[in-house]
């Protein structure tokens, strides 16, 4: 005899999900957490550059430039722009 004949198969009315219309608080909490997780994941994938740049730099635009010569300010701006440009290069385009 093969193993397939030994396995119990569920009857037709047991194929459905048993947690439908459940008032169990654990099921409700798990559903809410799952939905929130999915929403946050989608937002993260859509806006990850903005989000991580915000957490990295905060609301400030950068360090204060009081008392710093203009040449050093320009050098700092170029470094920041190069860092942003380099950040864009981590995407890989694969053409088949």
Curated annotation (Swiss-Prot):
Positions annotated as glycosylated: 20
Chain positions of site Essential for channel activity, possibly by being protonated during channel activation, and by forming the channel gate and the selective filter: 37
One MF term in the entry's GO annotations: proton transmembrane transporter activity
Positions of transmembrane segments: 23-43
Annotated site location: Seems to be involved in pH gating: 41
UniProt-listed Gene3D superfamilies: 6.10.250.1640
Main location group: virion
Regions of this protein lying in the Intravirion compartment: 44-96
UniProt keyword Lyase present: no
An example Gene Ontology CC term for this record: membrane
General remark: When the channel is activated, one or more imidazole moieties of His-37 probably become bi-protonated.
Entry protein name: Matrix protein 2
Originating organism: Influenza A virus (strain A/Memphis/4/1980 H3N2)
